Amino acid sequence: MNETDMKLVVVGAAGRMGQTLIRIIHETAGVRLHAAIERTGSPFIGRDAGELAGAGPMGVAVTDKPLEAFVEAEGVLDFTAPAATVEFAGLAAQARIVHVVGTTGCSADDEARIRAAARHARVIKSGNMSLGVNLLGVLTEKAARALPAGGWDIEILEMHHKHKVDAPSGTALLLGEAAARGRGIDLADHSVRVRDGHTGARPEGSIGFATLRGGSVIGEHSVVIAGEGEMVTLSHSATDRSIFARGAVAAALWGRSRKPGFYSMLDVLGLD
C-alpha cells in the first residue's frame, strides 16, 4: 500500500459488480479500497469487504454510512440503482470527490440531478465502462453518418442475464445515441422499442431496439445496419464482468486530476 494510492469507495459492495470492483481494486496498482458501502439492514454490514469479494481479508469492514466514507475518500465507484445513484451523487458533490457512475436505467430527472451534482464533483458516467463498447460507439456513429437513412435501417440488439432489471440496456442506449448523433437526429424522437401485432411498415430513419434476457449472459450487443441487398453488423461480446470494473477504476484515476464537471468514458479514453 502506497500513501499516494487513490482512496476509493465501492457502493453496493455485496452485489455482483460491487464484489468485482473490490477484487479489481485489490489487484490494481495506484488505488486502494477505502470503504465498502451497503444499504442499512444488509446482512453484510460488518463483514470484511475483501472476504466478501473472495479476495481475502482487506481490513475494510462493510458499512452503511456513505457520507462518512466519502469525506475521507477521493472517489466512489457506483453500479447500483437510479435512486441510490442520485443520493450518492449528492453526497459525492458534498465531499467534492470523483463519482464514477455505471448505473443504468436512470430517468431524465435522475440524469438532471446527477449532472447538477457535477458542479462540485467530477462525475464520469457511461452506460458501459469497457474500451471495446466505447470504440463500438464511435464506429456506430461513423457508420450511421456514412450510410444514409433513406437506404439503411439501424437496429440494435442486446442480450443480458435473466436478473437484469432495465431494458433496453444502458449500452444499447449508448449505441443508439451514437447512431442518432451520426444521423443528426434526436434518439428519443426516433427510437422504436416495442413491436407487437400489426405494426405497419418500418418508419424511415427510425432506430429500433430488440431486447433478450436469459441465463448468465454478461452482455451481447449488435448494431445492425440493413440496406437493400447488404447488411453491416457491428458487435461486442463481454465474457468477463471485470472489463467494466477495470474501466471504472481507470476512469476514477483519470478523474482524479480533472476539474468538477460531467464526463463520459469517451473523454477518459480520448475517443471524443
Curated annotation (Swiss-Prot):
From the Swiss-Prot or TrEMBL record, state where the protein is found: Cytoplasm
An example of a Pfam family matching this protein is DapB_C
User: Which pathway does this chain act in?
Assistant: Amino-acid biosynthesis; L-lysine biosynthesis via DAP pathway; (S)-tetrahydrodipicolinate from L-aspartate: step 4/4
- Kindly list the GO CC terms recorded for this protein: cytosol
User: In which residues is (S)-2,3,4,5-tetrahydrodipicolinate bound?
Assistant: H161, G170, T171
Q: Where is the active site?
A: H160, K164
GO biological process terms, alphabetically, are:
diaminopimelate biosynthetic process; lysine biosynthetic process via diaminopimelate
Principal place of residence: cytoplasm
Ligand binding (NADP(+)): R39
Q: Which InterPro entries match?
A: DapB_C (IPR022663), DapB_N (IPR000846), DapB_N_CS (IPR022664), DHDPR_bac (IPR023940), NAD(P)-bd_dom_sf (IPR036291)
Q: Which residues form the signal peptide?
A: none
Q: Which domain of life is it from?
A: Bacteria
Q: Which UniProt keywords apply?
A: Amino-acid biosynthesis, Cytoplasm, Diaminopimelate biosynthesis, Lysine biosynthesis, NAD, NADP, Oxidoreductase
Binding-site list for NAD(+): G12, A13, A14, G15, R16, M17, E38, G102, T103, T104, S126, G127, N128, M129
* Entry EC number(s): 1.17.1.8
**Catalytic function, reaction form:** (S)-2,3,4,5-tetrahydrodipicolinate + NAD(+) + H2O = (2S,4S)-4-hydroxy-2,3,4,5-tetrahydrodipicolinate + NADH + H(+); (S)-2,3,4,5-tetrahydrodipicolinate + NADP(+) + H2O = (2S,4S)-4-hydroxy-2,3,4,5-tetrahydrodipicolinate + NADPH + H(+)
What role does it play? Catalyzes the conversion of 4-hydroxy-tetrahydrodipicolinate (HTPA) to tetrahydrodipicolinate.
Family (UniProt): Belongs to the DapB family.
Q: Which PANTHER family match?
A: 4-HYDROXY-TETRAHYDRODIPICOLINATE REDUCTASE 1, CHLOROPLASTIC-RELATED, DIHYDRODIPICOLINATE REDUCTASE
Output this protein's name. Answer: 4-hydroxy-tetrahydrodipicolinate reductase
